[in-house]
Amino acid sequence: MLGKYVCETEPLSPGLRRLMWRFLQNKNLNTFHAQELRFIHLVLCKMYNFGLNVYLLREATANAGTYDEVVLGRKVPAEVWKLVYDGLEEMGVSSEMLLCEAYRDSLWMHLNDKVGLLRGLANYLFHRLGVTHDVRIAPENLVDGNFLFNLGSVLPCRLLLAAGYCLAFWGSDEHERWVRFFAQKLFICYLIVSGRLMPQRSLLVWASETGYPGPVEAVCRDIRSMYGIRTYAVSGYLPAPSEAQLAYLGAFNNNAV
């Protein structure tokens, strides 16, 4: 048992265990070895891809059989459509074509017929958000007829914004503490979704009785309390967000924290 409510499904490897303890002890990322940092970066990329595809599948299921643009676009921020517009311009689509409904319909049919173009448009959006690794979208999600609506709906999700923030500002001393804060949560989440850590159902009851902080933070607190590791208040070590941080985390007029 790692905590009162958390156990290992099988013993963690020495490397994973070392990383987990360093994160739980809130160690500065600059003290990690190069191999550890490369692995953490890989985990962040994997979590971004995993979260993106899970959210896209959720939206595709929710929007199945829906053709009403108002309904489909209900969760898509205007900022996303501006990125899509810029991406289409980069692909050579003129403003005149986008203003004509017939041209828009033909363009959408063309993009769906040429999945490579649709993937390229999605990659443009990711790059504008600072996510430059090879984002792998499951073919089933990519060929969904409502893909752009689905993608626009999920980009503001907290998990994707947190992972995207870490990837966009990876290696920047100015952003280290915020990257560390998000990377810690994402690493513990990775251990849970990969089946290495198994929270008990009673964890949620305990968390709800102690000022419910969220499932991942509840796991962190449980393990820390078991081993006597100090729990750091967010306000105690996180600086006030800079303009660059607020611009990224609030890019879609939402609260990512």
From Swiss-Prot:
Any signal peptide, and if so, which residues?
A: none
- Localized where? Host nucleus; Host cytoplasm
For the keyword Transmembrane helix, the answer is no
Give the phenotype of cells or organisms lacking this gene.
Lytic replication is able to proceed normally with the expression of immediate-early and early genes as well as viral lytic DNA synthesis, but expression of viral late genes is severely impaired resulting in no detectable virion production.
Report what the protein is called.
Answer: Protein UL79 homolog
Q: Which InterPro entries match?
A: Herpes_UL79
Q: What does this protein do?
A: Plays a role in the expression of late transcripts bridging viral DNA replication and late gene expression during infection.
A GO cellular component term found in this entry reads:
host cell nucleus
Listed A to Z, the keywords are:
Host cytoplasm, Host nucleus
Fill in the subunit field for this protein: Interacts with ORF30. Interacts with ORF34.
The entry assigns this protein to a family as follows: Belongs to the herpesviridae UL79 family.
| Family annotation (Pfam families) | Herpes_UL79
Instruction: Please classify the protein's predominant subcellular localization into one broad category.
Output: host cell
